[in-house]
Amino acid sequence: QSPGCCWNPACVKNRC
């Protein structure tokens, strides 16, 4: 369970 996708540049919702 991650709070967002800060570590994933390919994530559509790249937010922490």
Swiss-Prot record:
Name the UniProt key words of this record, in alphabetical order. Acetylcholine receptor inhibiting toxin, Amidation, Disulfide bond, Hydroxylation, Ion channel impairing toxin, Neurotoxin, Postsynaptic neurotoxin, Pyrrolidone carboxylic acid, Secreted, Toxin
Name positions with the PTM Pyrrolidone carboxylic acid: Q1
In the record, which residues are listed under signal peptide?
Answer: none
Q: Keyword Membrane: yes or no?
A: no
Carrying Cysteine amide, the residues are C16
Q: Which GO terms describe its cellular component?
A: extracellular region; host cell postsynaptic membrane
Question: In which compartments does the protein localize?
Answer: Secreted
Q: Name one GO molecular function term.
A: acetylcholine receptor inhibitor activity
The answer to whether keyword Disulfide bond applies is yes
| 4-hydroxyproline: modified positions | P3
Disulfide bridge partners, by residue number: C5-C11, C6-C16
Q: In which tissues is it expressed?
A: Expressed by the venom duct.
Q: What does this protein do?
A: Alpha-conotoxins act on postsynaptic membranes, they bind to the nicotinic acetylcholine receptors (nAChR) and thus inhibit them. This toxin causes paralysis upon intramuscular injection into goldfish and blocks both fetal (alpha-1/beta-1/delta-gamma subunits) and adult (alpha-1/beta-1/delta-epsilon subunits) subtypes of vertebrate muscle nAChRs in a dose-dependent manner.
Instruction: Let me see what the UniProt entry remarks about domains.
Output: The cysteine framework is I (CC-C-C). Alpha4/4 pattern.
Instruction: Give the family per the record.
Output: Belongs to the conotoxin A superfamily.
For this entry, the protein name equals Alpha-conotoxin PIB
Origin species, per record, is Conus purpurascens
Q: What is the lineage of its organism?
A: Eukaryota, Metazoa, Spiralia, Lophotrochozoa, Mollusca
